[in-house]
C-alpha cells in the first residue's frame, strides 16, 4: 500500500497517529523507575533446585559434545534494567526491545544470541530549521550515563545527546506505543512517534511477520514555517566485517 492509500485508510478508520490511546502505561523519559534487585534464596530453596541445575549442566554437556552452542549459560551474568518498553516484531519472530527512554535494546533475533545493551547507532534523530536562521537538532532518545560512558567522542559521542527528558513521554498499549517529544528539539515543535507491531486478531500467519511500523507526526505551533528532517540510523544487525563496531557477534549453532 502506498502512502496515499495508507492515508485514505487512516482517514476511513478515523486513526489519529499523533493521539495516544486513552488508557496507556506512561513514563516520562526522566523517570528513573524501580531498580531491579537480585533476590535471595534460603538454604531449602537452594537444595530444591539442585536436580534442575544438574539436569541443565547435563544438557549443556550433551550439546557441547555434539558441537553445538549451549542454549543457556547459567554462569553468564545477565544484564537487566527497569527501562524496557514494548518489544518490536510479530509473534514468535524474535524481538527487538525498545526502552521507554527512546532507544532500542534487548535484541533477541537469533537463537542463543541475546544483545542486552542498547546499540547507540540505532536511533531516530530530528533536525529543525526556520527561515530566521534558527536551527535545532537532537537524537530522539536518552540513554543512561552508563550507556554513554567510554563512547568515542569522535564518532557516536559527537552526536547531539541533549534531549530534555522532562519534555518527553512514552505511552504503551500493546501492540502499540507512542513517544511524544513536546518541544523537542524546537520549543515550538511537537513530534509524536507511533510504533505498532502486526498483532492481527484471528490471523496468526500475518501476526508472525518480523516487522513493525513507525509513524511520525510533526506539529508546528510557531508563527513561522519549519523545515523538519527525521533521520533513522541502524548498525549492522546480522554480522560481517563491521559487526564489532556495532557491538554484534557471529556464532554458529552447529559446527560443520
Label every PLM stretch briefly.
Residues 95-97, 104-107, 188-192, 202-203, ...:
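Short helix/loop capping segments that flank catalytic or ligand/cofactor-binding pockets
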Residues 91, 98-101, 109-112, 131, ...:
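An acidic- and aromatic-residue-enriched active-site/binding cleft used to recognize and process polar
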Residues 198-256:
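Polysaccharide-binding surfaces and accessory modules of carbohydrate-active proteins
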Residues 145-211:
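Extended, loop-rich substrate-binding clefts of extracytoplasmic carbohydrate-active enzymes
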